[in-house]
Amino acid sequence: MTTFLIKHKASGKYFHPKGGTSNPPNGTNLVLHSDIHERMYFQFEVVNERWRYIKHVASEKIVHPFGGKADPLNGTNMVLHQDRHDRALFAMDFFNDNIRHKGGKYIHPKGGSKNPSNGNLTVMHGDEHGAMEFIFVSPKNKDKRVLVYA
């Protein structure tokens, strides 16, 4: 299973559990931050050929929209939680560099900024634009994309 960092393409910041702990509690917000460390590594956990869980390696918790709804509202915070269900499934669109929730919305920096500050929350939103592009990169080389569906 490939380990990767989730990099906000426009700002170069990365997904982190808020507070940066290795075992954050259920419901911990996911934020963007410029630091790189082993507590912000992720992996895909395959469910079927398209949909996957995004797993926080250190805690083995899964990326979820807060509340775990099938069709989260625009602005719903992204969090880590231990539960695995179809409302926590995501797919990567490598052509457009976005992360799509099974309900159809995408992960965005809250506020839609191309250069969000450290600690900016990540949310679900239906809009598509350059500020919501993410790429998966190697923890050993933050400029090298990794093949995460292999």
Curated annotation (Swiss-Prot):
Expressed in mantle. Expressed 51 and 1.6 fold in mantle and gonads, respectively, relative to that in hemocytes. Expressed at a much lower level in other tissues tested including gill, muscle and hepatopancreas. Induction: Up-regulated expression in the mantle following V.proteolyticus bacterial challenge reaching the maximum expression at 24 hours (about 1.5-fold) post-injection and then decreasing back to the initial level at 48 hours post-injection. Glycans are attached at N26, N74, N118. Transmembrane segments: none annotated. Optimum pH is 9-10 for hemagglutinating activity. The activity is decreased by 25% at pH 6.0 and by 50% at pH 4.0. Keywords: Glycoprotein, Hemagglutinin, Lectin. One of its GO terms (biological process) is detection of bacterium. Gene3D superfamilies: 2.80.10.50. Thermally labile. Complete loss of hemagglutinating activity after incubation at 60 degrees Celsius for 30 minutes. D-galactose 2 binds at H64, G67, D83, R84, H85. Hemagglutinating activity does not require Ca(2+) ions. Hemagglutinating activity is inhibited by porcine stomach mucin (PSM), bovine submaxillary mucin (BSM) and fetuin. Agglutination of V.proteolyticus bacteria is inhibited by D-galactose, but not by D-glucose. Fungal binding is inhibited by D-galactose, but not by pathogen-associated molecular patterns (PAMPs) including lipopolysaccharide (LPS), peptidoglycan and beta-glucan. GO terms for molecular function: galactose binding; peptidoglycan binding. This protein may have potential in cancer diagnosis and treatment. The keyword Glycoprotein applies. D-galactose 3 binds at H108, G111, D127, E128, H129. D-galactose 1 binds at H16, G19, D35, I36, H37. The N-terminus is blocked. D-galactose-binding lectin. Binds both alpha and beta anomer of galactose (Gal). Binds strongly to branched beta-Gal-terminated glycans and weakly to unbranched glycans with alpha-Gal on the end of chains. Has strong affinity for both Gal and GalNAc. Binds glycoproteins containing mucin-type chains. Has hemagglutinating activity towards human group A erythrocytes. Has hemagglutinating activity towards rabbit erythrocytes. Agglutinates V.proteolyticus bacteria. Oligomerizes in solution. This is D-galactose-binding lectin. The lineage of its organism: Eukaryota, Metazoa, Spiralia, Lophotrochozoa, Mollusca.
